[in-house]
A protein has these predicted regions:
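Catalytic-core signature of thiol
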Residues: 4, 8-9, 14-355
C-alpha cells in the first residue's frame, strides 16, 4: 500500500510523462504562462509542489525551504487589498502608450543612479504584512534621492507609514494600500527611517529579521503569528536630536501608472523605481532564481514590491524587482518576473510619486 508521499510521487511521474510532449512544444515563457494549470497542480504544496515546478518548466528554479516559505506566506496581505480603496478612485493616472521614444532592451536603476544607495537596499519586513508600507517607503527613498540629484540620501521610514497611516491605509501588519501610503506621504509627511535598531534616524524598522541570515547579526526567531501593528508615536527615537514634525518629508505628487508595459518602463527610466502589487501563489515563496512564471500551487494573498528595471534573458522579457524578504531570498533579495503579460497582476497596480 502506497503512502501519501509515494502516491504524489507516482502522480508527478505519470503527469510529467503525460504532458512531456505538450511541454516540449512550448517555445516561450508567454506560451507557458497562457496554458491552463491542471486542477491537481493547483492543490500541490510543499516538496511535491517544488518537484512539480522544477519538472514542468525551465524558466525559474524553485528550492524547498519549508520554514522560510511558511514564514513568508504567513506575512502576505489578504486578497482584499487588491481592490481600489474606497473613495480613492479619482487617483491621477499617467503613462500613455509609448510610440515615438526608443526604450533600451535592458535597464537597471542601480546602474543609472549610482549616487542613490537606497535603490540597492533590500529591506526585511519580518513577520508582519507590512510589504505595502515597506515597498512604498523604499520607492519614496529612491525617488527622493534621484530627484534631489543624489543630494538627499535619507531613507523614508516604513514604520512611520505602517503605524501612523491607520485606518486610512488599511490594517497595518495585516495589509494595506500602496496608493494610500503615497497619499499619506503627500498629506502628512513621513519621517526618516532605517534598519532595525539603526541609530541616527527618527524611526527605524520596528521588527527584527526572523532567524539567521548570512553575514547579519542574529536577533532571534519570530513568533509563529504575525506581529501586532506598532503604535503610532508622534516622536523620534531617543537620542535622535530632532523633533518628529521637523524631520518629516512630504511628497509633492502622487499618481498611478496605466498598465502599458512601455509606459511603465519609460517612467522608471526617467524618474526611478515604482511600487507595485501582485497576486502571490505558493510556488513564488520557493523561488530561487530565474524568471518567475506561476506554475502550480494555491493563491495565497497579495504582496507589494519595488520594480527597479527590466531585461531579456534567452528571449524572455522580465521585470527586475526588489523584494522585502532579506538578501538571502531569491537572487540576493531580488526576483525577476515575466514582463508585458500582466502576469499575476504585476503591471496592474503600480503607484509612485514625486518629491
Amino acid at each position: 500500500m502506497l503512502n501519501q508521499k509515494q502516491l504524489i510521487s507516482v502522480l508527478l511521474i505519470f503527469t510529467s510523462t503525460l504532458f512531456h510532449d505538450s511541454f516540449e512544444k512550448v517555445l516561450t515563457i508567454e506560451e507557458f504562462a497562457d496554458r491552463p494549470i491542471p486542477k491537481y497542480a493547483e492543490q500541490l504544496s510543499g516538496e511535491a509542489l517544488v518537484d512539480y515546478v522544477n519538472r514542468q518548466q525551465p524558466f525559474f528554479e524553485a528550492e524547498y525551504l519549508p520554514e522560510v516559505a511558511e514564514k513568508r506566506l504567513g506575512s502576505l496581505m489578504k486578497m482584499d487589498f487588491l481592490l481600489l480603496p474606497a473613495g480613492m478612485d479619482n487617483v491621477t493616472m499617467v503613462g500613455e502608450p509609448v510610440t515615438n521614444e526608443e526604450l533600451p532592451e535592458s535597464f537597471d536603476s542601480r546602474e543609472k543612479w549610482k549616487d542613490c544607495p537606497s535603490i540597492s537596499y533590500i529591506r526585511d519586513q519580518s513577520n508582519c504584512g507590512s510589504c505595502w508600507a515597506v515597498a512604498a517607503a523604499s520607492t519614496m527613498s529612491d525617488r527622493l534621492c534621484i530627484q534631489s540629484k543624489g543630494k538627499i540620501k535619507t531613507l523614508i521610514s516604513d514604520t512611520d507609514i505602517l503605524s501612523c497611516c491607520q485606518p486610512l491605509c488599511g490594517d497595518g501588519c495585516n495589509g494595506g494600500s500602496l496608493m494610500r501610503a503615497w497619499y499619506y506621504a503627500r498629506d502628512h509627511g513621513v519621517c526618516s527611517g532605517g534598519r532595525y535598531e539603526e541609530k541616527g534616524v527618527c524611526k527605524p524598522y520596528a521588527f527584527h529579521p526572523c532567524g539567521r541570515h548570512k553575514g547579519q547579526k542574529y536577533h532571534g526567531e519570530c513568533p509563529r503569528h504575525i506581529y501586532k501593528t506598532p503604535l503610532c508615536k508622534p516622536y523620534c527615537q531617543y537620542g535622535y536630536g530632532k523633533r518628529y514634525k521637523d524631520d518629516k518629508i512630504y511628497a509633492k505628487a502622487v499618481y498611478g501608472i496605466f498598465s502599458f508595459e512601455d509606459a511603465i518602463r519609460m517612467i522608471i527610466m526617467k524618474k526611478g523605481p515604482v511600487s507595485a502589487a501582485f497576486t502571490v501563489y505558493e510556488d513564488f515563496a520557493y523561488y530561487r532564481r530565474g524568471v518567475y512564471v506561476h506554475t502550480a500551487g494555491k493563491k495565497t494573498g497579495r504582496h507589494a514590491v519595488k520594480i527597479i528595471g527590466w531585461g531579456v534573458q534567452n528571449g524572455t522579457k522580465y521585470w527586475t524587482v526588489a523584494n522585502s524578504w532579506n538578501t538571502d531570498w531569491g537572487e540576493d533579495g531580488y526576483f525577476r518576473i515575466l514582463r508585458g503579460k500582466k502576469h499575476c497582476g504585476i503591471e496592474s497596480s503600480i503607484y509612485t510619486g514625486d518629491f
